[in-house]
From Swiss-Prot:
Residues 14-249, 264-506 form the ABC transporter domain. The lineage of its organism: Bacteria, Pseudomonadati, Pseudomonadota, Gammaproteobacteria, Enterobacterales. It is found in: Cell inner membrane. Its EC number is 7.5.2.11. It is a peripheral membrane protein. NCBIfam families: PRK10982.1. One of its GO terms (cellular component) is plasma membrane. This is Galactose/methyl galactoside import ATP-binding protein MglA. InterPro entries: AAA+_ATPase, ABC_carbohydrate_import_ATPase, ABC_transporter-like_ATP-bd, ABC_transporter-like_CS, P-loop_NTPase. It comes from Sodalis glossinidius (strain morsitans). It holds the Pfam family ABC_tran. The gene is mglA.
């Protein structure tokens, strides 16, 4: 299929030509191109570490490019920072939302540029201007509401409305649907299409293939810091996109696995958490070598189960038995001592120490084990274990001293999982482990889960991706509004059946 050309599509709104950027020991970008035209939604795809974030940081002046040019609306530009880019009409809606929760919605909309009447803020005009934008975008939110009262999807929409208020010509969206329900996603898509109709060029970053086919007009694919292709989405298949992203054909999305669950290792009976709203009367068994999925819609309290098992949430009732013996797991340290490990849902908030290095992040879950009787650290064993995490998990990093925040999401997740494996867990609990991660890294995590199950470990995975649960688990526990509404054998169920169960108590 022929690549999109200027002659085919008309003048570009944004042209990033032959952008190159190097860091010590790493060629992050090598002559990369990204061309976006008005009235279009342009997908930017690639595995974690392909160079997407670096390219956008060059656009916003966070990194200075080594070579290449950036042309916006026909003029060459070199933005010094994101504020200058925003003022010129280039906006980005981040995964990590930036609302001030204690302020009102309209305060957040106009922060730093309040309309004034003399020396005072003109609250009436600020309200009216916000309401006008909301009406144009069909946003049903009171401008006077506090940021803290908004859902994640509403916060996402406010960020888009803010870009709209700057009269942005280019809007970049980074994984905007990662925490949204299907209904919220559809509302977000309708707003994105309104921006497109106004002439905006949307750069859309997502690992969710179905969204790319549903929403996007063109796609640019990066791999290992290089531009691979820019093509119309229409006519492409999922397998073609994956092959361009990973450099090979992925004939299967999940590893081959023979399910051979052994004896019951974990027995949970009538588990109820103390904190409200809570889970109530949750009972299940986990077998050696089993991968157990937990499904449910947003608000089902799936995460509460693993947090209670791990001692983060206090239980008010119920029993936990490991290999036939009662355990309490009244704290995370106690849970770890019993062989539990938890990879949390919010990787950036609770999984990594973003400003510390890969080495520290590899060891932090097990740091006490490196101390001798004198309280001194065994540096030799620490270095050996750090290298094990990097090698065993195939972490792409310049070295163990690199800040983990500079790594791609997939590589950050590999470090987190690797550090828990250093604790030699019997039960590994994974909460949305592949959220925001590319297909190649997903497959590696599935392979790891399969290998651990083969060794007799018990795996619990929470996922909002139904194909993921159906593709990797043995059984699926279904939750609705804090209650367990079913336990199904994966081979004997369907997506529709799971969704039916998950909707029982809504």
């Amino acid at each position: 299929m022929a690549d999109i050309t200027t002659e085919q599509q008309g003048e570009w709104l944004l042209e990033m030509k032959n952008i190159s950027k190097s860091f010590p020991g790493v060629k992050a970008l090598d002559n990369v191109n990204l061309n976006v035209r008005p009235h279009s939604i342009h997908a930017l795809m690639g595995e974690n570490g392909a160079g997407k974030s670096t390219l956008l940081k060059c656009l916003f002046g966070i990194y200075s490019k080594d070579a290449g040019s950036i042309i916006f609306q026909g003029q060459e530009v070199n933005f010094k920072n994101s504020k200058e880019a925003l003022e010129q009409g280039v906006s980005m809606v981040h995964q990590e939302l930036n609302l001030v929760l204690q302020r009102t919605v309209m305060d957040n909309m106009w922060l730093g540029r309040y309309p004034r009447k003399g020396m005072f803020v003109d609250h009436k005009k600020m309200y009216q201007d916000t309401k006008t934008i909301f009406d144009e975008l069909d946003i049903d939110i009171d401008p006077r509401d506090k940021g803290a009262t908004l859902s994640v999807s509403q916060m996402q929409i406010i960020e888009i409305a803010k870009a709209f208020s700057y009269d942005a010509k280019i809007v970049i969206m980074d994984e905007p649907t990662s925490s949204l329900t299907e209904k919220e996603v559809n509302h977000l898509f309708s707003i994105i299409r309104k921006l497109k109709a106004r002439g905006c060029g949307i750069v859309y970053i997502s690992h969710k293939m179905e969204e790319i086919f549903q929403l996007c007009d063109e796609i640019t694919i990066l791999r290992d810091g290089q531009w691979i292709a820019t093509q119309p989405v229409e006519g492409l298949s999922m397998d073609q996109i994956i092959a361009m992203m990973v450099g090979r054909s992925l004939s299967q999305h999940f590893p081959d696995r023979i399910s051979e669950p052994g004896e019951v290792m974990l027995e949970v009976r009538n588990l109820t958490s103390l904190r409200q709203p809570s889970i109530r009367d949750i009972s299940f068994d986990l077998h050696q070598g089993e991968i157990l999925g937990i499904a449910g819609l947003v608000g089902a309290r799936r995460t509460d189960i693993v947090e209670t098992l791990f001692g983060i949430r206090e239980k008010s009732a119920g029993t936990i038995r490991l290999h036939g013996k009662n355990i309490k797991n009244s704290s995370a340290n106690e849970a770890i001592s019993h062989g539990f490990a938890l990879v949390t849902e919010e990787r950036r908030a609770t999984g990594i120490y973003a400003f510390l290095d890969v080495g520290f992040n590899s060891l932090i879950s097990n740091i006490r084990s490196y101390k001798n009787k004198m309280g001194l650290l065994n540096n030799t064993r620490m270095k050996s274990d750090i290298q094990w995490v990097i090698n065993a998990m195939r972490v792409k990093t310049p070295g163990h001293s690199a800040h983990i925040g500079s790594l791609s999401g997939g590589n950050q997740q590999k470090v987190i999982i690797g550090r828990w494996l250093l604790t030699q867990p019997e039960i590994l609990m994974l909460d949305e482990p592949t959220r925001g991660i590319d297909v190649g890294a997903k497959f590696e995590i599935y392979q790891l889960m399969t290998e651990l199950a083969k060794r007799g470990k018990g795996i619990i995975i929470i996922s909002s991706e139904m194909p993921e649960l159906l593709g990797i688990t043995d059984r699926i526990l279904v939750m609705s509004n804090g209650q367990m509404v079913g336990m199904v054998n994966t081979k004997e169920t369907s997506q529709n059946e799971i969704l039916r169960l998950a909707s029982l108590y809504l």
